UniProtKB/Swiss-Prot annotation:
<feature type="modified residue" description="N-acetylserine">
    <location>
        <position position="2"/>
    </location>
</feature>
<feature type="region of interest" description="Disordered">
    <location>
        <begin position="323"/>
        <end position="386"/>
    </location>
</feature>
<feature type="modified residue" description="Phosphoserine">
    <location>
        <position position="251"/>
    </location>
</feature>
<feature type="region of interest" description="Disordered">
    <location>
        <begin position="122"/>
        <end position="164"/>
    </location>
</feature>
<keyword id="KW-0007">Acetylation</keyword>
<dbReference type="GO" id="GO:0045766">
    <property type="term" value="P:positive regulation of angiogenesis"/>
</dbReference>
<feature type="modified residue" description="Phosphothreonine">
    <location>
        <position position="638"/>
    </location>
</feature>
<dbReference type="GO" id="GO:0038084">
    <property type="term" value="P:vascular endothelial growth factor signaling pathway"/>
</dbReference>
<feature type="modified residue" description="Phosphoserine">
    <location>
        <position position="253"/>
    </location>
</feature>
<dbReference type="GO" id="GO:0007173">
    <property type="term" value="P:epidermal growth factor receptor signaling pathway"/>
</dbReference>
<keyword id="KW-0209">Deafness</keyword>
<feature type="compositionally biased region" description="Basic and acidic residues">
    <location>
        <begin position="672"/>
        <end position="684"/>
    </location>
</feature>
<feature type="modified residue" description="Phosphoserine">
    <location>
        <position position="266"/>
    </location>
</feature>
<feature type="region of interest" description="Disordered">
    <location>
        <begin position="544"/>
        <end position="656"/>
    </location>
</feature>
<feature type="modified residue" description="Phosphotyrosine">
    <location>
        <position position="659"/>
    </location>
</feature>
<feature type="modified residue" description="Phosphothreonine">
    <location>
        <position position="387"/>
    </location>
</feature>
<dbReference type="GO" id="GO:0007165">
    <property type="term" value="P:signal transduction"/>
</dbReference>
Length: 694
């Protein structure tokens, strides 16, 4: 036994090496933990075959120990409810199994005391009481966030036209004092969600006012009284008046300050204009707002109510823009209920009731596709739009030459899926465009997609449904039902009633179906078949290397690198004792680096041979063999023989075999010449026996 104070001893089950965890048994060994603080010996952990053995199987140097983990789990039946801990050294990881949890904790505590390990901070599971608690001022920090973020979180479930800005009551004064221009307080306004039973015309009044903006709209200033009878920015005025919603402030008063707001386009709500008042007076929505209330003015400035509408030639009718319910109510006094929506605009006259002055063509040509209008349609969410292609615009001009024409809104780039849904319905009512106006000759009926997985091409026009070709044959015959092919096609006229249209044509048989099925030769009687070889699959590497893993109760202990620096690895690490039971015998360890044993003259020879300093140079003696490759092909040329460098500093790369191509004719000539020379030499020596042979 080695010296040192015995700190702990007991029975433990030891794991085999990491690469043999699945194939070798975990054997029970007697472990002894020794501390050399008093005697000066190293701190070691020894294990013996039994408790009365005198020679240890192996000695584990604890100076090389890096970490100790307690409470591991191993995916093996015999270790399901075991108490496993490991000792992680530089050379190997030792997994040890204790009989009880107290014994495991005792071993771990003793080893950590000797090695100076402390619990690491990388424990995956923390005590329930150690979870971070929210500070007392956390709700205050959350409430003092920008109101815009609170509004987004509170109104995330509402549709886009009803994005409300909700400010807590205790933050109203705080937000106004800090910066009242950062956000808009809609305290004096009320909004409500749209009813599910609203009609399409009523839903046209609840479009968002924050979709478009342009510099063509007049600024929100109080216009002069002389502007009340003139068109503004290409729009006609209207005699109807809409008032702003009532303010809850008691000091608000009614004033005659007006906001002249232009109107937007709409495909389903058109203004009703009498011929007598069309030329003299246009239509304009005038909003009467109190000038004494600064909050309403600030509100109206922040609400984006501008349009991307350039001036249009002629008397083009503009559809009035609608606002969400509650934002602008139909009231003339401030004490009226603000939840009443504005009145529905009058329906348009028939085409024959209007004067020729009211009719104008579409102000955008087919080439002006980049400067089309960008106006959201009322009654829909801003993500939907109405689109008319260039070909459809040309047809629209032909069909509506004597009818009313309207400015067509441009599609939003975010959504191109919806095309002319409401616009098509409106023109179908007005008899401007019929359902079958698009001729079927213009549709490509014979289109065959090259990609069999691609769906049939959808036409850009949505006036009519795409014509489904009954006899459409795709490129791949596997995806087509040939049984229904030609059933709707009548027979040719010259055939008469010889073939019934209900009789399907003969189904073509693919070439692959004509091949006979494979024959199983093993089904023949009295057939002698060799048994299939037994497949022994090697154990996968990941299964061999599978080791005990960490669990939620695993605790790790390691040395603090800042306080206890790692000592350098000693020269003699490996044990010289036998370990036949665990296959850890290392008595015959041979270093892989030959430089460690270069002083041995019996292995590699002297370094001074041939002036070389490398121990890998082979000694040049009588037994050095050179190989010659005899090539009997006379057509090949003989390459020059390389000279080996024998000076100082020759490397291992120079010690290689040179292969020489030998010519057959030259070899035979040399052989005959040498034989003739040898015969002549022997005859000469026989005549003069006194002459010594050189």
């Amino acid at each position: 036994m080695s010296g040192g104070e015995v700190v702990c001893s007991g029975w433990l089950r030891k794991s085999p090496p990491e690469k043999k965890l699945k194939r070798y048994a975990w054997k029970r060994r007697w472990f002894v933990l020794r501390s050399g603080r008093l005697t000066g010996d190293p701190d070691v952990l020894e294990y013996y075959k039994n408790d009365h053995a005198k020679k240890p199987i192996r000695i584990i140097d604890l100076n090389l120990c890096q970490q100790v983990d307690a409470g591991l789990t191993f995916n093996k039946k015999e270790f399901e409810n075991s108490y496993i801990f490991d000792i992680n050294t530089i050379d190997r990881i030792f997994y040890l199994v204790a009989d009880s949890e107290e014994e495991m904790n005792k071993w771990v505590r003793c080893i950590c005391d000797i090695c100076g390990f402390n619990p690491t901070e990388e424990d995956p599971v923390k005590p329930p009481g150690s979870s971070l608690q929210a500070p007392a001022d956390l709700p205050l920090a959350i409430n003092t966030a920008p109101p815009s973020t609170q509004a987004d979180s509170s109104s995330a479930t509402l549709p886009p036209p009803y994005q409300l800005i909700n400010v807590p009551p205790h933050l109203e004064t705080l937000g106004i004092q800090e910066d009242p221009q950062d956000y808009l307080l809609l305290i004096n306004c009320q909004s409500k969600k749209p009813e599910p039973t609203r009609t399409h015309a009523d839903s046209a009044k609840s479009t968002s006012s924050e979709t478009d903006c342009n510099d063509n709209v007049p600024s929100h200033k109080n216009p002069a009284s002389s502007q009340s009878k003139h068109g503004m920015n290409g729009f006609f005025q209207q005699q109807m008046i809409y008032d702003s919603p009532p303010s809850r402030a008691p000091s608000a008063s009614v004033d005659s300050s007006l906001y002249n707001l232009p109107r937007s386009y709409s495909h389903d709500v058109l203004p009703k204009v009498s011929p007598s008042s069309t030329e003299a007076d246009g239509e304009l929505y005038v909003f009467n707002t109190p000038s004494g209330t600064s909050s309403v003015e600030t509100q109206m400035r922040h609400v984006s109510i501008s349009y991307d509408i350039p001036p249009t030639p002629g008397n083009t009718y503009q559809i009035p823009r609608t606002f969400p319910e509650g934002t602008l109510g139909q009231t003339s006094k401030l004490d009226t209920i603000p939840d009443i929506p504005p009145p529905r605009p009058p329906k348009p006259h028939p085409a024959h009731d209007r004067s020729p002055v009211e009719t104008c063509s579409i102000p955008r040509t087919a080439s002006d596709t980049d400067s089309s209008y960008c106006i959201p349609t009322a009654g829909m969410s801003p993500s939907r739009s109405n689109t008319i292609s260039t070909v459809d615009l040309n047809k629209l001009r032909k069909d509506a030459s004597s009818q009313d024409c309207y400015d067509i809104p441009r599609a939003f780039p975010s959504d191109r899926s919806s095309s002319l849904e409401g616009f098509h319905n409106h023109f179908k009512v007005k008899n401007v465009l019929t359902v079958g106006s698009v001729s079927s000759e213009e549709l490509d009926e014979n289109y065959v997609p090259m990609n069999p997985n691609s769906p049939p091409r959808q036409h850009s026009s949505s006036f009519t449904e795409p014509i489904q070709e009954a006899n459409y044959v795709p490129m791949t015959p596997g995806t087509f039902d040939f049984s229904s092919f030609g059933m709707q096609v009548p027979p040719p006229a010259h055939m008469g009633f010889r073939s019934s249209p209900k009789t399907p044509p003969r189904r073509p048989v693919p070439v692959a179906d004509c091949e006979p099925p494979p024959v199983d030769r093993n089904l023949k009687p009295d057939r002698k078949v060799k048994p299939a070889p037994l497949e022994i699959k090697p154990l996968p590497e990941w299964e061999e290397l599978q080791a005990p893993v960490r669990s939620p109760i695993t605790r790790s202990f390691a040395r603090d690198s800042s306080r206890f620096p790692m000592s350098p690895r000693p020269d003699s690490v490996h044990s010289t004792t036998s370990s036949s039971d665990s296959h850890d015998s290392e008595e015959n360890y041979v270093p892989m680096n030959p430089n460690l044993s270069s002083e041995d003259p019996n292995l590699f020879g002297s370094n001074s041979l041939d002036g070389g300093s490398s121990p890998m140079i082979k000694p040049k003696g009588d037994k050095q063999v050179e190989y010659l490759d005899l090539d009997l092909d006379s057509g090949k040329s003989t390459p020059p023989r390389k000279q080996k460098s024998s000076g100082s500093g020759s490397s291992v790369a120079d010690e290689r075999v040179d292969y020489v191509v030998v010519d057959q004719q030259k070899t035979l000539a040399l052989k005959s010449t040498r034989e003739a020379w040898t015969d002549g030499r022997q005859s000469t020596e026989s005549e003069t026996p006194a002459k010594s042979v050189k």
